[in-house]
Amino acid sequence: MNPYRFENQNREIVLSRYNVPTPWMNYLSNGTLHAMISQAGGGVAWYRSPQIWRINHYRFFHLPTDRSGFYTYIKDGDAVWCPTNEPCACKPEKWEAAHGMGYTRFSAERDGLHAEATYLVSPLKNVMLWHLELRSDRDRNVTVYPYVELGMMEFMRELQWQCYNKHQLSVYEKDGVLIYRYGVENQPKPDETPLVYFASDVPAAGFDCDRDEFVGSYRSEEAPVGLEHEHLKNSTLFGGDPCFALELPLTLRAGETKSLNIYLGTEMTESEISKSLAACKAPDFFTASMQKLADSWEDFFSGFQCSLPDKDAETMINIWNPYQMERNFRFSRNISYYATGTFRGVGVRDTAQDVLAMIPLQFDRAKEKFEQLLTQQYQDGHCNHYFFPTEGWEPVTRIHSDNHLWLVMDAYHIALEEGNVAYLDTQAPYFDGGSGTIWEHIKQSIRFTTQNMGAHGFPLMLSSDWNDMLYKVCRKGKGESIWTGMQFAVALRMMQELAERKGEPEFAEECKALYARQQALCRTLAWDGAWFRRCITDEGRFIGSESEPQAKIWLNTQSWAVLSGLGTQEQQRQAMNSVKEYLDTDLGIKKIHPAMTTDYPTKEENLTCYNKGCGENGSVFCHANTWAIIAECMLKRPENAWKYYHQLLPMIAQKTAGAERYKAEPYVYSSNIFGPESDKFGLANVSWLTGTAAWMYLAATQYLLGVRPTWDGLEIDPCLPEHLLPAKVTRVFRGCRYEITITKNQKLLLPHVDGRKQLTVTV
């Protein structure tokens, strides 16, 4: 039985089974306070940064899985159960959960007692709000125990030094509010570290701040010893293992519904906590928070909507893909069920790609994020790899051959969305001092690549390109990336256009000449006969060739030969035919074929430690699939493009593999799916935070549906199979709302007219 259903009118996925193969997550956030929560109530909250201001424990990779979280125990006579289903052994008789846009809701019933718990981070205050409604079929007295297992805010410090540092923590009660003070020596940014508070709008009959008192020795969240006592111990904690637990007694009459709210929040001082709680306890606070949340998402989604005969694709394009994309834009690749949130800040490469997809939906946010990325560029044009704007730590300074070129693509598409190049005159600082206009920044991106070319004429790999595992081909500094040459060519085309519009014909000609050089190399030296080679090692060996014993064909150089236009038309078609022949599976396109052993190309300089079919070594790397979809659209092969897109839709991939094999969420994209050379073929891995989200959105909206900005207006250039026609699209562009009906794959330009607010057109 399918354990879920989509309810698109509410933008929700509703689950009927709590013990799905892995935790299926949702993200809650107001931009400052954040949380992720599973379908069983497990999860973690953090203030601004999960590295230095993590609020509660979440035990990654441990058993039982998905612990701890945000739990509300209901004690009804001798029975103790949770609306979240977990962690109690005593289960509800009826249960379902729903993940929505910025909230998660649980509905459960046991012995005539119905409970509905809604979790959200309020957009009005820095508080994670737990709203609980109880309805009884008879008179009864119940006690509600909300519980959070607190941890040290610095996760890595806790792993290493908790035996000392936990005795520098304080959790105490003041005026009915539990307050957690994190005051550890040498902590980063102590003046910005908030107090965390826990309270309810129902008077508490007891509380605990000491985890040992509430949970008990050799106990777990499944059966806390505190629930066996008449009352909690009112324990405070000045050193030890902290928690928040409240005891909230309620009397319910037959047929009566009572609601209560629990507040897990942050403020800088006790007085600010009091003010915040006064606002939170207003009768309409929950309703107002939900309404503001709904309004913000309605505005977000209004920039692009579509209607398609394929309702799975429509569900992803209209709701879950842009929702996931926004979460990537907000959190980069920092913390998820798979990523511990301990070492990655904001990746320049990662976030620059997120910006591309955000431009049509939230233009100002996209510009702001792009300008933040520019601060990580050096005067010579290269960029830091990732950085820590909240934590203030030193950035990771590895020089990759691709990072700075993504900035060119961002700048181009921002200018294109506006229809002019004036934005490029905006000043932006360099990381190593001084400043320049955005135009000067991206010109330096081009200069850096031209000054770092290899012996064969392709860009040097440097620390690696987009495919991080290729760092081993360039340890001596001579390895070259054929793929980066293709990315460079895409950037050069964009720069040529921008230069012409800025009145710099000499630079435009320079870009044109550089492009021609890469094109000539690609059509000769990079061409292997049936596909394009991938890279060149320090010793001059071509990786990605029929003559090689392993990893003969790589996906990215085939798709980007089309995206860049470097290959001849015949080469482009042949390369993508080879993708279909050697790399395509019913669960997506493999990254390479065949997978490598751990002694290729040599035992000393092996390219991978991954098992065959896993990760970089022959999995379906979903991010890279997106470029193949775009390439097939550019070649005007809609059947291939749609196959590659449709088979990767998470609900379709899960159905193909089977829910127990696929494991991950059926409503968001994953980074990779184990390939056919693995005995776990079909296992989805690293969901939510992946560049797949941004590029699947771009592939669907700008290439399959074909609605793309141009300098002169909105271009409609769809590439859809016949069974998907007619399709309808709403796109807001330069202040005008376009209502477009697509009846055939025909190219059409809708010129922009200043002042026009709406246009309805049929293609």
Locations of regions flagged by a protein language model:
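Aromatic-rich carbohydrate-recognition surfaces in CAZymes
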Residues: 75, 346-351, 355-458, 481-489, ...
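Surface beta-strand/loop "capping" patches
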Residues: 709-742
